Amino acid sequence: MDIDQFISKWERSAGSEQGNSQTYLGELCEVLEVEKPRPTTGDPARDAYVFERGVDYLDDDGARRRWGRIDLYKRDCFVLESKQGRRADDGTLPGERQARPGMDAVLERARAQAKQYIAALDRSIAPPPPFIIICDVGATFDLYAEFTRTGGEYTPYPDARAKRIRLGDLRDPDNLDLLRTVWTDPA
């Protein structure tokens, strides 16, 4: 699949994150020409690049353990959390979302969720990955980085104004190269 086919297929996607995320990200791997995620084994030491990587973490008040699943995890590279906004039916340009009230808040909560998952990863297996990717399926990728690999503060990457890669921006080879680097050799 080439980038134009990918964008054309996904720019008007709708439905649920759960119904679309894994297919979308698998096809993105094809476009990036990187390996696709492997089957999950349930063994954290072996699940280095998988969808739905299980983690046990403390909730926001630190009082209760919870079970969660990282949408896409690649050891030494990233934790990716995905959401999906509504499809634009109002005459906006293809690939643009309706101004869904609260979508930025949804994406910020996904970032907080990713940070909880990172804190819960077993550091005896590997240090925290350098990137968090927040994906609005069919619309955007927001990048955050923390290169000390201590799980500290993940900041917008490369900066606050340029952290978001829109679906149509993937036609720019520099954006494809950036995502490919995050996927394969981010350090």
Region roles according to the model:
Residues 1-47:
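Charged, often low-complexity linker/regulatory segments
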Residues 1-8, 15, 61-68, 77, ...:
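Short, basic/polar, glycine-containing "phosphate-handling" surface segments that engage DNA
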Residues 22, 26, 53, 70, ...:
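N-terminal, well-ordered alpha-helical segments
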Residues 28, 38-76:
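Active-site metal-binding core of divalent-cation-utilizing nuclease and nuclease-like domains
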